[in-house]
Amino acid sequence: MNHLIILVVAAVFLGMASAEDVFHKRFTVSCLCASDGPSVHGNKLTGTVAVGGCNPGWHKCNTEHNVLYECCKKN
């Protein structure tokens, strides 16, 4: 019985982790990092908009100061 509970908890945990990855891939907005160049024409937007600030493991990648969001790039 204990093995079954552990198996169910592990399956739920793995399901939540993969659901978070899917959400991040589908619902992200790209932004222009300082390393992308002076304009968006022909350049890839390598940053991701993060509401309220960059998440752990990410860093702010431009020089703009916004109250609601930051342009972040994964370390």
Swiss-Prot record:
Residues in the signal sequence: 1-19
Protein location: Secreted; Nematocyst
GO molecular function: toxin activity
GO cellular component, one term: extracellular region
Post-translational modification as stated in the protein's UniProt record: Contains 3 disulfide bonds.
Major location category of this protein: secreted
Pfam families membership: Toxin_4
Protein purpose: Toxin that is lethal to crab.
Protein's name according to its UniProt entry: U-stichotoxin-Hau3a
Native source organism of the sequence: Heteractis aurora
Organism classification: Eukaryota, Metazoa, Cnidaria, Anthozoa, Hexacorallia
Name of the gene encoding the protein in the UniProt record: HAUTX4
